[in-house]
Amino acid sequence: MNKTVGSTLLVAGTMIGAGMLAMPLTSAGIGLTATVFLLIGLWAVLTFTALLFVELYQTANSDVGIGTLAAQYFGQAGRIISTAVLIVFLYALIAAYVSGGGSLLMDLLPAMGDKDTMNKIAVLVFTIFFGSFIVIGTHSVDKINRVLFFVMIAAFILVLALMLPNIKFDNLMAMPIDNALIISASPVFFTAFGFHGSIPSLNKYLDGNVKSLRIAILVGSGITLFAYFLWQLSTHGLLSQNEFLQILREDATLNGLVKATLEITQSPIIANAVKIFSTLALVTSFLGVALGLLECIEDLLKQSFDIHAGRISLGLMTFIPPVLFSLFYPEGFILALGYAGQMFAFYAVVLPVALVWKARAIHPNLPYRVWGGKALLVLVLVLGVIITSIPFAIRAGYLPFVVG
């Protein structure tokens, strides 16, 4: 039970990133009602595909990664494609996290050189300190994540306590100024429910216990959905649609949103609470993603090359590439992040649907089977493909632009 609680918080902590705070800017022209329905729909899709991995793991050892699952049903081609996509995606995410973590840490460190030197030092300190928990093992990640998660939630509750008394019912009734904005916002909210790269680590940590993994996924993603709802309720209730649109014109960033809420609540505490939350959200997301990457590399080496690398070696392979990209070639991970939605859709939607399709043909009587037949699998697959094509339609001018 203790591991199940920890796994649940890892699921929620991985999803609830610092980007959550700026999500109301994405939904600024949509209104609360449409935003809530969109969030619930995308939560349902991505929780469904996460549970497909639970079903799949009944046919494999508890310590194998997604690449080995893909190889089990699609041969070495499946392993190569799935592993390559997952590793590139997670490397790009970690590079972004260490870059962001370094920027936050730089303000706290004593001056030891120019700004560029201080940034490099801060990135290294951030990576070494929090990366050490990854190297030690999932148990240590579980422990620190619990502490960080509860402090993060405390900061979040403080922000809500300052905002909720000031919400206006009329603001909550705002309708979309353009229905096409709902479509444009879908990819941003879609990736906000991503934690699928951490599922192999959680399954291994829970010793392949199907019930515990299901609980961790359902409750962890449910906590995330509830947090997203409360934040959207608070911001959409506090700010009118016209005020949102003014923020988009003047400063379409989290700072712009915080400044607007500060003017209404008249509480300087809110800015500090938001900073604490965003910092801890970045760290908990970093922990979940890095743990998933380390386990992915371990699975690749063990299953493909029969190399049983130690945790320190795996840690170096996990963190050196993204740190180098972050410090010396940031354009590289920024380019990769430009295709983050497509890579995420592949391993969070396309891959589990394809694997379960084959697995059910080979293993028709598994003890646990996710609800829904082939029609639902096809529907989810089509939705995933459509959502990932939306950014291209926005760039081509067929859909309106949204922040995110």
Positions of PLM-derived features:
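Membrane-interface "cap" regions at the ends of multi-pass membrane proteins
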Residues: 1-25, 30, 47-51, 63, ...
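Select transmembrane alpha-helical segments in multipass membrane proteins
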Residues: 2-11, 75-89, 176-186, 263-281, ...
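Transmembrane alpha-helical segments of multi-pass small-molecule transport proteins
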Residues: 8-15, 83-86, 108-137, 151-159, ...
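TM-loop-TM module centered on a large, flexible mid-protein loop between adjacent transmembrane helices
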Residues: 64-76, 222-282, 303
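Membrane-water interface regions at transmembrane-helix termini and the short interhelical loops
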Residues: 103-107, 126-148, 205, 326-335
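Helix-loop-helix junctions that connect adjacent transmembrane segments
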Residues: 113-125, 139, 146-259
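C-terminal membrane-solvent junction of multi-pass transporters and transport-like membrane proteins
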Residues: 119, 176, 294, 301, ...
